[in-house]
Amino acid sequence: MAAKKRILTACVRLFIERGYNGTTVAEIIKEADVSASSFQNIFRSKDGVLSELAAFMFAGQFKAARTVADPGDSPAMLYAIETALQLTITELNDNLRDIYVEAYSHEATMEYIYQSTTAELYRIFGSYLPDYTESDFYELEIGSAGIMRGYMSRGCDMYFTLERKLERFLNMSLSVYNVPEDERRRIIDRILELDMRAIATSVLHELVQMLADHFDFALDDEIESALVQ
């Protein structure tokens, strides 16, 4: 367990500071002060670390969305808040964008996302698509996850602003789940009224602290300062 803790601590630091693709296994082993065989026995590969971290991060996002939402908000609004948070987090730091995009690119983490999200989508949007089974929602999630990956991959600029990205994504994804146009408009207007960058910054720090608490490692100033570029 001590070796696993050191590896996770090293990966959180290196992934945040350098990105997933910018971090090598050799750098992780050196930072964690473990042998190559220990790393392979615990995680097998860098993808194994990503899977474990991603599972925790995605679960934490749903919890964070509930703290942002008002008590009377609909499940569809909660979905909009959670997905808007994820898109905004990837705009805070290109290395975080790299982590999230990779999570949507590797078979193991993609399948985790599909399966864990399907039940949530069925609960949220089942009333909009009453004839659909969980299997149907699994198939829809494959498509909506592809939309999410595409929008995360493309960074914002002076023309394609965060607000435009959120509006485009939410209109497309809510349409997939048969949310009526007037309700989509109300949800999108509400999201655009929120200071999503400030909310996402706060949520990001909470998520990383939750990671530290869950995997029992200490955060330091370097990790904290690297979160938001």
Predicted regions and their residues:
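Helix-turn-helix
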Residues: 14-48, 52
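Amphipathic alpha-helical packing segments from all-alpha helical-bundle domains
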Residues: 104-156, 160-171
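C-terminal peripheral helix-coil segments that are non-catalytic and often amphipathic
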Residues: 123, 127, 157-229
